[in-house]
C-alpha cells in the first residue's frame, strides 16, 4: 500500500468536492479546479475527507496511487490557500514589470522579454531592492508567482527563470529564492 496514497485528504468547510467517474472537481474560496484521474484509482468521499483507493494491485495502479492522492490534495490546498513560488532577480538594470496579463522582463537583452501569464496566475513584484546572498554584494528584487494550480505556478516560474538563468561567476540572473549558488572563481591572470 502506498504510504502517501492511503492517507485521507481532509476537506475544509469552505470547499465543495464533486466526483463524477474519474473526474474530480474542487471548488473553494479562491477558485475551481478539476482533474481527470487515471482509471486505476477511485476517489471516495467519506464525511469531511477524501480517500483515494486503487482498483487492483497491478503495477500501474500502484504507481499512480500516491500520485493521484497528491494531485487531489494539491487541488484542495490550491482552492483554499493557493500556491506561491518565491523568486529573485539579480543584476544591474534587471527588472520586472507586470501590465495586465503580460510580464515584461528586462534582463540584459536589447529588448524586454514579454511573457503572457495564463489565466489564474499572477506575479507580485517587491519594488524595494534587497541585498542578495551569494551574489558578490549585488542588489536584487524579490518577486513571487501566485496561483491556485500548483503545476501552472511551477511552469510559469520555470519559464521566467529560463529567460536569464543564473550566471556562475557574478551570480546574476533569475533564480528561485530557495536555490543556492556556488560562485566559481574567475581567471587568475599572469603574475
From Swiss-Prot:
List, alphabetically, the Pfam families matched. Answer: Ribosomal_L6 (PF00347)
InterPro entries given in the database record: Ribosomal_uL6-like, Ribosomal_uL6-like_a/b-dom_sf, Ribosomal_uL6_a/b-dom, Ribosomal_uL6_bac-type
| UniProt GO MF annotations | rRNA binding; structural constituent of ribosome
Report the GO terms under cellular component.
Answer: cytosolic large ribosomal subunit
A Gene Ontology biological process in which this protein takes part is: cytoplasmic translation
Q: Which UniProt keywords apply?
A: Ribonucleoprotein, Ribosomal protein, RNA-binding, rRNA-binding
Known HAMAP family for this protein?
Ribosomal_uL6_B
- Biological role: This protein binds to the 23S rRNA, and is important in its secondary structure. It is located near the subunit interface in the base of the L7/L12 stalk, and near the tRNA binding site of the peptidyltransferase center.
Subunit text: Part of the 50S ribosomal subunit.
> Which PANTHER family does the UniProt entry name for this protein?
60S/50S RIBOSOMAL PROTEIN L6/L9 (PTHR11655), LARGE RIBOSOMAL SUBUNIT PROTEIN UL6M (PTHR11655:SF14)
Family membership: Belongs to the universal ribosomal protein uL6 family.
Specify the protein name: Large ribosomal subunit protein uL6
